[in-house]
């Protein structure tokens, strides 16, 4: 079991939070690989991941983790095509980045807050919103779904149920992000 939440370099949620998380993860995986002679830790990083803000890649590199998909220049669309051809049932599963990415940088992360966001997203997924993010900003829940589905959340019955569910989870207000679901949105605050 990893303990990244016990590390302030992770739980304080700085812009390089992923570095602390991956460092912790790889510190647990390295001994397992060492115990299995000739084994090496590999990850699923693909070519598309290399263009985004990914401080965890540095921790993986430092730990000697291999990234065969990226090394072979395989991108996300290729991973999906190969997965479909191989009959994997999850070939078209939407990306689900770490729940810590739902919090603005600098806003502390805890087990309870991660659980709250996880339950909020599960509520929406159960209602057919496979691609969803619930961004936690203080006590507010900001809902992101693909732009073409925004209107569905404004239908009175679903809207009222959504607000009730978010309030029951401990949020004090609920808003809908009119820009829709945009990957990496929180990284806009990072200079460069």
PLM regions with names:
Residues 1-85, 126, 141, 157-171, ...:
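ATP-dependent adenylation/nucleotidyltransferase module used to activate substrates
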Residues 136-147:
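Short, aliphatic-rich beta-strand segments
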Residues 149-150, 165:
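Short Lys/Arg-rich amphipathic alpha-helical segments
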Residues 132-134, 151-158:
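C-terminal, charge/polar-rich interaction regions
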Residues 128-137, 177-181:
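C-terminal boundary motif of the adenylate-forming
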Residues 184-192:
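Short, low-order "capping/linker" segments at domain edges
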Residues 26, 110-117, 155-159:
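Generic alpha-helical secondary structure
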Residues 70-76, 80-124, 128-132:
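Mid-to-C-terminal catalytic subdomains of enzymes
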């Amino acid at each position: 079991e990893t303990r990244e939440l016990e590390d302030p370099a992770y739980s304080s949620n700085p812009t390089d939070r992923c570095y602390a998380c991956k460092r912790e993860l790889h510190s647990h995986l390295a001994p397992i690989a060492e115990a299995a002679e000739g084994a090496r830790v590999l990850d699923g990083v693909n070519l598309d991941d290399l263009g985004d803000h990914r401080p965890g890649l540095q921790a993986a590199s430092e730990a000697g983790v291999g990234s065969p998909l990226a090394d072979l220049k395989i991108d996300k669309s290729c991973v999906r095509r190969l997965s479909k051809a191989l009959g994997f049932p999850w070939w078209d599963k939407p990306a689900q980045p770490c729940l810590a990415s739902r919090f603005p940088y600098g806003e502390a992360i805890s087990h309870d807050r991660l659980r709250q966001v996880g339950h909020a997203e599960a509520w929406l997924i159960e209602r057919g919103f496979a691609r969803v993010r619930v961004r936690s900003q203080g006590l507010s829940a900001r809902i992101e779904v693909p732009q073409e589905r925004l209107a569905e959340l404004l239908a009175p019955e679903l809207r009222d149920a959504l607000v009730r569910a978010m309030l029951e989870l401990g949020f004090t207000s609920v808003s809908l992000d009119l820009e829709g679901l945009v990957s990496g949105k929180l990284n806009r605050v990072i200079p460069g």
